[in-house]
């Protein structure tokens, strides 16, 4: 009787143990998660170039690898009962975390250049009052914050009565920004430019060029200023030209990956794009919402309905 009562219990335990053996897809998920954690540590340690490459290329690749492992797990779960197993729950939780945090930008990217500063004084790149569509250190006001190359980048456009265009904004000419002169925020040497790309109609954009027509100025060693989405044919410069602060470098356009005319501008620590670290760009002697600012970062609008970015213009 004693043997008879123990054997079924022991059999059930062995059966459950066999049923919850860790399948190869679960083991693969565990290995991938371990690599994913190490990759995030490299990013968070702000190691410069290694962290940039891991953030730009490594994390998305790991996030993408979670998809085939997930499909593998689904197939094994459907065709190999029992469906509910502790090991499978762990496996699916891991691939979900990898896929989500590897593919969805969640917070400002940590960079070794966060404390960078310079003696160069940067002026605003336009002559009258414009609205800051995106700018500042926080993700809530600056969607650029999740991207290494333009972590502290800005988008600007002029507005009238809260609108960036007249009528319905169906044509480029209806946007107040289109054709407006853009000036150099600081003196520098032209090291790269693009001037021949088309301007797209509003709500359309290039699928091949991010920056569109643009100018890159080498302000000082390891400091490169990018001004992007310029109007076709508006750049009056050639590579090697020396540009003085306040000189015209182009006109606002809608080239590249821009759904409506605006100016994008940022600093980065090397010429290569997008494999670079953004540098904090602070402007000097400007007016923000009617208040004089000696040095600061104009703040963009939040995602809340009716939100407005700071209205900024050159100071005296």
Task: Give the positions of each predicted feature.
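Membrane-anchoring/interfacial helices and their immediately flanking loops
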Residues: 1-46
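Membrane-embedded alpha-helical segments of integral membrane proteins
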Residues: 30-77
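Internal/C-terminal transmembrane anchor helices
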Residues: 83-110
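Surface-exposed, glycine-biased beta-strand/turn segments
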Residues: 101-212, 307-316
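A structural signal for short beta-strand/turn segments enriched in small hydrophobics and glycine
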Residues: 188-190, 240-252
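Acidic, glycine-rich catalytic/binding loops that coordinate metals and/or anionic ligands
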Residues: 209, 241, 266-316
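Short histidine-centered loop motifs in beta-beta connectors
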Residues: 223-246
